[in-house]
């Protein structure tokens, strides 16, 4: 049962017992719980893979922004670095050092970065997947965490393909890249690998919307809404989902305010209304 369904059930039970004060308290607790739900997203990959740019894009931040993860030639990430979402600070995207830069084998790498705190992993590559990527995926599988492969810089890959192919077909090229990645992962024992082709500078193109939907589906319901609100507005379906989440929260705010207003406690309604501003 989702947090929302549980809250509604408890509120209805309180109202059936004519306990409006308990109902209001349940609603307020639910809203507080929503605000405190953390979401920790781990992004890792080899040097030059576009990992830090992906961290910024996922947060809706330009690389030139003061809050952006540093990007550039060479490995700039030497230890896990937290980048909170600019609007939803409980959502944190972690820029992790590439496994090849830590001198730790894959199983020790996960312990080194504190894998337990992450809700899921995104492994970023810019061209072919590296041996370290495969090893890391295998270790994450053993730990029971969800992970997703992102082939970043796909726009650059397509441009190179267009210049080198006599009969260039974008869809066929994308499909070939995707199939090659999946085949390589399967050959190394990764079960049902999920590969997404992404441009860090044009998230609305290629597979980023599908990546979003896949992560949403895999997350528990109480974290799913947190993710939806934090994702960049790259298409109309994103905006629609955000409206639905906000609409759901608004009904709890409205109920809390209306219920508190009915309680014979001087000043309590005003305090509740102020809390909604």
Please annotate each region the language model reported.
Residues 71, 81, 91-108, 149, ...:
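AAA+ P-loop NTPase catalytic core and its hallmark functional loops
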Residues 1-96, 101:
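Conserved G1/Walker A P-loop phosphate-binding module
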Residues 227-256:
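Cytosolic-side membrane-insertion boundary helix
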Residues 121-126, 149-152, 197-198:
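Conserved beta-strand segments of the P-loop GTPase G domain that flank and frequently precede/overlap
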Residues 116-120, 143-147, 190-194:
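Short glycine-/polar-rich loops that comprise or flank the Walker A/P-loop
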Residues 75-81, 91-139:
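Switch II of P-loop NTPase G domains
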Residues 153-226:
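Canonical P-loop GTPase G-domain recognition
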Residues 247-277:
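Membrane-inserting effector segments that mediate pore formation, membrane fusion
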